[in-house]
From Swiss-Prot:
<dbReference type="GO" id="GO:0005829">
    <property type="term" value="C:cytosol"/>
</dbReference>
<feature type="binding site">
    <location>
        <begin position="19"/>
        <end position="21"/>
    </location>
    <ligand>
        <name>shikimate</name>
    </ligand>
</feature>
<dbReference type="InterPro" id="IPR006151">
    <property type="entry name" value="Shikm_DH/Glu-tRNA_Rdtase"/>
</dbReference>
<dbReference type="Pfam" id="PF01488">
    <property type="entry name" value="Shikimate_DH"/>
</dbReference>
<keyword id="KW-0028">Amino-acid biosynthesis</keyword>
<feature type="binding site">
    <location>
        <position position="229"/>
    </location>
    <ligand>
        <name>NADP(+)</name>
    </ligand>
</feature>
<comment type="pathway">
    <text>Metabolic intermediate biosynthesis; chorismate biosynthesis; chorismate from D-erythrose 4-phosphate and phosphoenolpyruvate: step 4/7.</text>
</comment>
<keyword id="KW-0057">Aromatic amino acid biosynthesis</keyword>
<dbReference type="GO" id="GO:0019632">
    <property type="term" value="P:shikimate metabolic process"/>
</dbReference>
<dbReference type="GO" id="GO:0050661">
    <property type="term" value="F:NADP binding"/>
</dbReference>
<comment type="similarity">
    <text>Belongs to the shikimate dehydrogenase family.</text>
</comment>
<keyword id="KW-0560">Oxidoreductase</keyword>
<dbReference type="GO" id="GO:0009423">
    <property type="term" value="P:chorismate biosynthetic process"/>
</dbReference>
<feature type="binding site">
    <location>
        <position position="252"/>
    </location>
    <ligand>
        <name>NADP(+)</name>
    </ligand>
</feature>
<dbReference type="InterPro" id="IPR041121">
    <property type="entry name" value="SDH_C"/>
</dbReference>
<feature type="binding site">
    <location>
        <position position="66"/>
    </location>
    <ligand>
        <name>shikimate</name>
    </ligand>
</feature>
<protein>
    <recommendedName>
        <fullName>Shikimate dehydrogenase (NADP(+))</fullName>
        <ecNumber>1.1.1.25</ecNumber>
    </recommendedName>
</protein>
Length: 286
């Protein structure tokens, strides 16, 4: 029951009305019996500093940060974890003993969660897209000891920047989506990860299209694991297509839940968080 003593955790971004985080986080908080609630708060760019400073003064125990503030929030934090610095993005904060914001990023741990039980050491991978999500995916693939990463994108400038950030850590190459070499790479890939928004229910993209078009996927075969970070609709057009090819498929729901569970553990100083409760809450909602 919410009382005058109840504290809160907030999601800050713009927009936030589509977020599923309140569903899964409040299910976990209720299960754990904590006097906390989780709310979503829309926040414009020009209000970010004011909102962040104001939340220090009231009963806010932690924050999730989403688009478009994941990079802008750096200047408002007193402590930043190595992984957040590496990714140049923050998604989780809590107030430290000095009433200042300590920050981290839980996206990498979220991404690798459904892959941990698979033997992927020294395997070959393809990442589709070169935006912010691709950074977390590439770092996760490095942590899982993949041998090579090929990043395919439409945007040469963001692709070049992404490759430059990781080229000293792993064998990585960037290709534009119309490069003829992609056909062979897809045929040989052990894992393909889609970080583009193509197929997402709430985007302007047509629902039944595949990232980079049907021809791009003609060499896909059943030995490849296909992981789509999109979780709505379930399954996505890409995962429907891949399942028909006999591929193992993974959607983005487990990543969403796992990164959320890691955030909740961060806010509660290492409390064991019920993944299954959060996952079931989202499945029931969707």
């Amino acid at each position: 029951m919410i009382s005058s003593k109840t504290s809160f955790i907030a999601l800050i971004g713009n927009p936030v009305s589509h977020s599923l985080s309140p569903i899964m986080q409040n299910a976990a908080l209720q299960y754990l019996g904590l006097d906390l609630i989780y709310i979503a708060m829309p926040c414009k760019d020009e209000d970010l500093e004011l909102v962040m400073n104001s939340l220090k003064k009231i009963n806010c125990k932690g924050l999730n940060i989403t688009i478009p503030h994941k990079e802008k929030v750096f200047d408002l934090c007193s402590e930043i974890s190595p992984i957040a610095n590496k990714l140049k993005a923050i998604n989780t904060l809590k107030l430290n003993s000095a009433k200042e914001w300590s920050a981290t990023n839980t996206d990498v741990e979220g991404f690798i969660y459904p892959l941990k039980t698979l033997n992927l050491t020294k395997k070959q991978s393809i990442v589709l897209g070169s935006g912010g999500a691709a950074r977390s995916v590439i770092q996760g693939l490095i942590n899982l000891n993949f041998s090579t990463i090929s990043v395919v994108s439409r945007n040469k400038s963001s692709l070049d920047e992404l490759i430059k950030n990781f080229e000293n850590q792993i064998t990585i190459e960037g290709l534009l989506n119309n490069d003829n070499r992609t056909e062979t790479l897809i045929e040989e890939a052990d894992l393909i990860v889609n970080t583009t928004p193509v197929g997402m229910k709430t985007t302007k993209h047509e629902m039944n299209v595949l990232p980079y078009g049907d021809v791009f996927w003609r060499s896909l075969n059943s030995k490849t694991i296909v992981y789509d970070l999109i979780y709505n609709p379930a399954p996505t057009p890409l995962l429907k297509f891949s399942a028909k090819k006999g591929c193992i498929t993974i959607d983005g729901l487990k990543m969403l839940v796992a990164q959320g569970a890691k955030s909740l553990s961060f806010w509660t100083n290492g409390l064991e968080v019920p993944f299954h409760i959060m996952n079931d809450a989202l499945k029931n909602y969707l």
